Amino acid sequence: MNVPFDRYVSFKNADWEGKSQRVMAKLQSHIDAADNPFWGYFAKKRTELNEKQGLDDLRVLHNYLPTLREILEESGDDETLAMLEDLEVTCM
């Protein structure tokens, strides 16, 4: 029997998809501003990971968590940083 594995079963009722979408929406302003070379790289890798490898945004955020945290701290974006940290604690 071939049953698809849901690696997020432990996140039931944690709204990991909604939280991931909200963090990505907040990060979009940084991507659009392009004030750091990382943002262009991150946007490109997100597209590649989503489309070519089938990874969702939670996984993309997890892959870049230390860098995202550092850049958000440096930029003073405490709101997005708090959202990212909540996502990490509840869903990663």
From Swiss-Prot:
Pfam families: CowN (PF20543). It comes from the Bacteria. Keywords: Nitrogen fixation. InterPro entries: CowN. GO terms for biological process: nitrogen fixation. Coiled coil: none annotated. Belongs to the CowN family. Is required to sustain N(2)-dependent growth in the presence of low levels of carbon monoxide (CO). Probably acts by protecting the N(2) fixation ability of the nitrogenase complex, which is inactivated in the presence of CO. NCBIfam families: N2Fix_CO_CowN. This is N(2)-fixation sustaining protein CowN. It comes from Rhodopseudomonas palustris (strain BisB18). The gene is cowN.
